Amino acid sequence: MSAIFEILDKDAGGRIGRLRTPHGTVETPTVMPVINPNIQLIPPKEMRNFGAEILITNSYIIYRKEELKSVALEKGLHGLLGFDGPIMTDSGSFQLSVYGSVEVTNEEILGFQQKIGSDIIVPLDIPTPPDVHYRRAEEELAITAERLEAARKFIQSEQLLAGPVQGSTYPELREKAASHLKDLNFEVYPLGAVVPLMEAYRYAELVDVIAASKKGLSPASPVHLFGAGHPMMFALAVAMGCDLFDSAAYALYAKDGRYITVNGTYHVEKLNYLPCSCPVCSKYTAEELKKADNREELLGKHNLYATFAEIRLIKQCIKDGKLLELVEQRCRAHPKLLDGLKKLYTHSSWLEQLDPATKGTFFYCGPESSSRPEILRFGKRLDRFSLQGSVIIRTGSVKGEKDYDQILTFKAPFGAFPVEMEEVYPFNAEVPKFPDYESLNTALSNTLKLIDLNPEAEFTFICEEEFKHPLIEEIRKRAKLVYRKDWKKE
């Protein structure tokens, strides 16, 4: 494990960690509020009041403006912003993505960040946008690789050096880039050029980008999802192993009169009530907030409170082993987020390697829960059950079951398992009495596999009449099938 990053707790791909920097230790996952050196809606010194432990600002803006540059060189970055905690600096790559060029070299901006005392330095990489031709993505990735190799040789101080992972929307390029950077031993790994995906709500593709990048990195590496600032998607990103986010949304949205919640964004003019209990929303009514002279500042503060409240909830869910339940709740806030959730579970084999083998009670939240790592893990381990003689499978206790050699409980979305394991994780799951189609499909598929793995056993399957599914007929071909209402022990 990296000496500067310590993982304390894990759930799914998410983790609570400690990131050590020259200006203090930061607990992750967390958000870095973006500070515009020219326009500060909320002073950096007040950011701790909202829960911020680390900030991010743009070194290129400071470098290009002489009055900011001179103060930063004289007093340091922390003196310029009036913040004594860790500060990360971007290099100008954002301006490069917007304007197509910047008036600084990689070595110049690296040296400037080092001189002003940035805690996390970012090289001048090439942010290749989504959907470009493969050749362009490959060529720009090669330039980025050269710059990052030069940066690794250039920065040898105690300051942390970030190695941005690029590769556009090509998973193979993302994984290749991440694997290369892993060998260079950067301290932080930002995933770059993903803002266009988030702005277009292309969460399924974002999931693929994150997964590919993570597969190329060490599991112990801290990962920063560049430009992710809306709390509605934090849980999904954390579950995939993202540790750091940065948010300019709190200020940009406030300027446009937008009010952030974990379920989406409201325009304040359309709000009759404030669905929040932060200090701002507890003090003002919706009408008072609309008419306030400092409305932009108040909205910015609310947006920060809402952002960090979600981070705290995510951390608690990691502690409780409930992160995926939160992800499934949050991803129902928008159809495109639901696409992201479904895409996440296509990576369940990878996620299962990261997910703890034991944790809190499994809660079934909907059809997507059937694809969770716990279910996949159970399906992989069916060959561990050796069954002989007469075997009864039932959803709940039935008369005469003790006459059988072995008793199995049937519980969707798992399938059949020994009755002795009913109170053991994950079989102590909270599930609906009547399973949906996807849940039943997974459970019956696993049951068929279990029956086929034990050809010497004679199976009796007692199920509910409500179990309407084509696989029931496949069960009937391999076992004696009786509906519970018809069960009579002779």
From Swiss-Prot:
Enzyme class: transferase
Catalytic activity: guanosine(15) in tRNA + 7-cyano-7-deazaguanine = 7-cyano-7-carbaguanosine(15) in tRNA + guanine
Entry-linked InterPro entries: ArchSynthase1/Queuine_TRR, TGT-like_sf, TgtA, tRNA_ribo_trans-like
Cofactor binding note: Binds 1 zinc ion per subunit.
EC number(s) given by UniProt: 2.4.2.48
Cellular component annotations (GO), alphabetically ordered: cytoplasm
Binding annotation for Zn(2+): C276, C278, C281
Pathway this chain belongs to: tRNA modification; archaeosine-tRNA biosynthesis
GO molecular function, one term: zinc ion binding
Main function: Exchanges the guanine residue with 7-cyano-7-deazaguanine (preQ0) at position 15 in the dihydrouridine loop (D-loop) of archaeal tRNAs.
Protein name per Swiss-Prot or TrEMBL: tRNA-guanine(15) transglycosylase
